[in-house]
From Swiss-Prot:
This is Shaggy-related protein kinase NtK-1. InterPro entries: GSK-3, Kinase-like_dom_sf, Prot_kinase_dom, Protein_kinase_ATP_BS, Ser/Thr_kinase_AS, STKc_GSK3. Pfam families: Pkinase (PF00069). Coiled coil: none annotated. PANTHER family: GLYCOGEN SYNTHASE KINASE-3 ALPHA, PROTEIN KINASE SHAGGY-RELATED. It catalyses: L-seryl-[protein] + ATP = O-phospho-L-seryl-[protein] + ADP + H(+); L-threonyl-[protein] + ATP = O-phospho-L-threonyl-[protein] + ADP + H(+). GO terms for cellular component: cytoplasm; nucleus. The active site is at 198 (proton acceptor). GO terms for molecular function: ATP binding; protein serine kinase activity; protein serine/threonine kinase activity.
Length: 409
């Protein structure tokens, strides 16, 4: 285990010692490894390490003959807070690179599932884990700090930006954002086997210059095993699939598809499609649009749900929910995503091949500011495993095939 210090900065109380020993962590924590064995610990003794100007010094390397390297992060500002802990923006003093550090209280009895998941992820549309370290407080609490790439904006804030201007988001951005969401979901669902369980605009990061989207916050993510129960109270309101509202515990990755459908509808409308303060409110909003679910649909969502006391309401036609000038492909994709029966929803990869995204496959398409689109077709072979030859040619348009030499197209 390493021994590291906290570098005092002006305006902060200097600790009595410049080098603070880190308590030995429980054995199960010692087993945790991330890509490239970059596991680090740091001791924090002055406050919680997230105040502006606070400096955290950590050591990486030292394994397999690698030289030890000191990395110092200066906390700049808090960018997110919740029941999980805190996310703060920080700057690496050695390189000048800006990062996001997610700091969560670590229960010593368990491995951290978010860290275990993030170790597996490597995709252009998923936020990248750079490394991690543990920190301890004076109260002997252990915190896990995930050092992540910093992406300055969220889809949520982009929606708010256009609402303030009283404008609809340009359709090219709607296509660009949702295409990348489905690419990320296809990767985590089929390559990694993980369900995110909290897809919402706040968890979709956007680079405002390139419009590249990255899925973040894997704090609720889980590998779903058939036959094993899961908690139904996950996913944020407005984006919760109906089977979760019905209390299903044997759900599938189709809950993420429903959430992504809600995000797409919100980008098109400028407001949530199914607002509701409670599960019942939410269900009422869904029924107003999709109509009352049939007995068969309820059985598909939760076989144990026998109460059937809903008012009989007819489905509201999708073309009446959206503006009459809305492209029919957009309406068609929303209708394929927002199905009561989880097994009738299209998969993430099927969504990526949908005609709604054909404009993105046109080599002449540009961003509203005239710039080229971010990389959209840099697939790796494992992402397209089992894809038919016909769909393969659709997924990787001719002009982009040199981006994927390993696919042999």
């Amino acid at each position: 285990m390493t021994s590291v210090g906290l570098a005092p900065v002006s305006g902060l109380r200097e600790s009595s010692s410049h080098s603070v020993g880190v308590d030995r962590l429980p054995e199960e924590m010692n087993d945790m490894r991330i890509r490239d064995d970059k596991e680090i610990e740091a001791a924090i003794v002055d406050g919680n390490g997230t105040e502006t100007g606070h400096i955290i010094v950590t050591t990486i390397g030292g394994r397999h003959g690698q030289p030890k390297q000191t990395i110092s992060y200066m906390a700049e500002r808090i960018v997110g807070q919740g029941s999980f802990g805190v996310v703060f923006q920080a700057k690496c003093l050695e390189t000048g690179e800006t990062v996001a550090i997610k700091k969560v209280l670590q229960d010593k009895r368990y491995k951290n599932r978010e860290l275990q998941t993030m170790r597996l992820l490597d995709h252009p549309n998923v936020v990248c884990l750079k490394h991690c370290f543990f920190s301890t407080t004076e109260k002997d609490e252990v915190y896990l700090n995930l050092v992540l790439e910093y992406v300055p904006e969220t889809v949520h804030r982009v929606i708010k930006h256009y609402n303030k201007l009283n404008q609809r988001m340009p359709l090219i951005l709607v296509k660009l954002y949702t295409y990348q969401i489905f690419r990320a979901l296809s990767y985590i669902h089929h390559t990694i086997g993980v369900c995110h369980r909290d897809i919402k605009p706040q968890n979709l990061l956007v680079n405002p210059h390139t419009h590249q989207v990255k899925l973040c916050d894997f704090g609720s993510a889980k590998v779903l095993v058939k036959g094993e129960p899961n908690i139904s109270y996950i996913c944020s309101r407005y984006y919760r699939a109906p089977e979760l509202i019905f209390g299903a515990t044997e759900y599938t990755t189709a809950i993420d598809i429903w959430s992504a459908g809600c995000v797409l509808a919100e980008l098109l409308l400028g407001q949530p499609l199914f607002p509701g303060e409670s599960g019942v409110d939410q269900l009422v909003e869904i029924i107003k649009v999709l109509g009352t679910p049939t007995r068969e649909e309820i059985k598909c969502m939760n076989p144990n749900y026998n109460e059937f006391k809903f008012p009989q309401i007819k489905a509201h036609p999708w073309h009446k929910i959206f503006h009459k000038r809305m492209p029919p492909e957009a309406v068609d994709l929303v209708s394929r995503l927002l199905q009561y029966s989880p097994n009738l929803r299209c998969t993430a990869l099927e969504a990526v091949t949908h005609a709604f995204f054909d404009e993105l496959r046109d080599p002449n398409t540009r961003l509203p500011n005239g710039r080229v689109l971010p990389p959209l077709f840099n697939f790796k072979a494992h992402e397209l495993k089992g894809v038919s030859a016909e769909n393969l040619l659709k997924l990787v348009p001719e002009h982009a095939r040199k981006q994927c030499p390993s696919l042999g197209l």
